[in-house]
């Protein structure tokens, strides 16, 4: 079982890694992570969602100039989609 601290730091590390620059998370970002944790979003879903959001961003960035991603909220929809996919996959295997 992942402890409270690791859930936050793993998400922070992945976001910083995918962004390509050190960016301290804001208090709103930390609150979003807390919301995910309280909602039972698995760490794997959060990390997959961050990766998916940045994959889409990078694909679009090749076509048009886009602003830098400055906050974790930009990944929120992809995290929720990844969590739903994990739930559906778990339901099929149950």
Feature roles, as predicted:
Residues 1-94:
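Intrinsically disordered, low-complexity, basic-enriched segments
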């Amino acid at each position: 079982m992942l402890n409270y601290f690791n859930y936050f730091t793993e998400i922070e590390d992945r976001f910083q890694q995918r962004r390509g620059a050190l960016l301290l998370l804001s208090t709103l970002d930390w609150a979003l992570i807390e919301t995910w944790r309280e909602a039972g979003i698995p760490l794997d879903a959060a990390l997959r969602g961050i990766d998916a959001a940045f994959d889409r961003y990078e694909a679009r960035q090749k076509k048009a100039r886009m602003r830098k991603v400055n906050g974790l909220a930009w990944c929120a929809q992809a995290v929720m989609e990844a969590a739903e996919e994990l739930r559906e996959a778990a339901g099929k295997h149950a």
